[in-house]
């Protein structure tokens, strides 16, 4: 189905283990067009939310555009803060014949970014993750909350 030039996969995870157990948000865009979303919060005994939806090629193309314009594929996480007790973030991307994987701590604000050893690279990561989360939340909300008239 997918050739080397149009191969696309993305996985994002952010989470921590605390007094409410393992709490996390994870989503992935798969090569077959499936978007998988999971959100686990045990706060007040919440249950895990899992959603799956198939996306059109136009939506996947927009996701690829967001990633390409961010230039995240040129970055390196060697000087980013490592995962700690606050939590961890992971971003894995395959676009064409390029593959990149990042692991860093949870980022609370731009102040954390500015204090890092690589503020430029981490800023790109921070804003890309923000854009991707907004994109995914919009897609999931549109797909599952629209009520027929």
Curated annotation (Swiss-Prot):
CDD domains (alphabetical): Mago_nashi
GO biological process, one term: RNA splicing
Keywords: Nucleus
InterPro entries in the record: Mago_nashi, Mago_nashi_sf
Location(s), subcellular: Nucleus
Gene Ontology CC annotations of this record: exon-exon junction complex
PANTHER family: MAGO HOMOLOG, EXON JUNCTION COMPLEX SUBUNIT-RELATED, PROTEIN MAGO NASHI HOMOLOG
Membership in a protein family: Belongs to the mago nashi family.
Protein name per Swiss-Prot or TrEMBL: Protein mago nashi homolog
